[in-house]
Design a protein with these regions (language model features):
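Short, surface-exposed coil-to-beta transition loops
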Residues: 105-108, 174-181
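Short, surface-exposed beta-strand/loop micro-motifs that present aromatic residues
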Residues: 94-99, 178-185
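Secretory targeting and sorting signals
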Residues: 1-35
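A short acidic-to-branched-hydrophobic micro-motif
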Residues: 95-128
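Short Gly/Thr-rich strand-loop-strand
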Residues: 44, 61-63, 67-81, 129-177, ...
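Surface-exposed amphipathic alpha-helical segments
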Residues: 196-224
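N-terminal "mature-domain start" segment
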Residues: 31-99, 223-224
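Short, well-ordered beta-strand elements
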Residues: 108-110, 184, 188-197
């Protein structure tokens, strides 16, 4: 059903050689920092998802087998660092959100439903265009290091894609943040999968965002 022709590659939180070079230059090769996204005593999210359209923790991307997401209380922050304005600007009719965390990482899945497929298609294009804003919300004193191109994802029905970028919250830090934004549209619904990690390295055959975007697309059949 899905494209399985991707080549095996070794990467340090990377989908391209260029991104790997950025990470090598950073010296970010140690274990993930617990500073951001630590689960601590987080409360389970209370978001209502009657159609089971949101991804489970096990369906969210990870870069190795020892990483494990935990659901946390729903955040009210941006879905992505690259998000230029409130999600309400996308014009959705309904929204469900689920947030996750692990030591050194955080992730979010949002499902948006729209009045019709045309409105959903416009929103899908807008989320892809977040790539133009990867440096907009980096903290003062930080630095955008790399933004990858938007890559298509073969999905069951509709459209899917993702992009990644790397930034430092503090230019003097030896550690960077690596973030991926995946999005898929099916009928009149859109699902956004965003995840970010600090200071981890991994070897994988295909970018783990791909499988999550594909799973999100399948789940959209329940609301589109």
């Amino acid at each position: 059903m899905f494209d399985s022709t991707a080549r095996t590659r070794t990467a340090v939180l990377a989908t391209t050689g260029a991104l790997a070079a950025v990470v090598t230059a950073l010296g970010v090769t140690g274990p993930a920092s617990a500073a951001e996204g630590s689960t601590g005593t987080a409360v389970t999210t209370t978001v209502v998802d009657p159609n089971d359209a949101l991804l489970r923790a096990s369906q969210m991307p990870v870069v190795n087998d020892v990483q494990d997401w935990s659901r946390v209380a729903t955040r009210h922050s941006r879905v992505s660092t690259a998000q230029p304005e409130s999600l309400s600007a996308l014009g959705f009719s309904d929204k469900a959100r689920r947030d996750f965390a692990m030591p050194g990482g955080r992730a979010t899945n949002v499902v948006l439903t729209f009045a019709d497929a045309a409105a959903a298609a416009d929103a899908y294009a807008e989320v892809k265009a977040w790539r133009q804003h990867t440096g907009d919300n980096i903290p003062a004193g930080g630095q955008l290091l790399f933004t990858d191109k938007v890559k298509p994802v073969t999905v069951q029905q509709g459209r899917g894609s993702y992009f990644s970028f790397v930034f430092k919250s503090d230019k003097s830090s030896d550690e960077g943040t690596f973030e991926w934004v995946g999005v898929t549209r099916r009928g009149s619904a859109v699902s956004i999968v965003d995840w970010r990690v600090n200071g981890a390295d991994a070897t994988y055959d295909v970018d783990p965002t791909i499988a999550s975007v594909q799973a999100a697309n399948i789940k959209l059949a329940r609301v589109s």
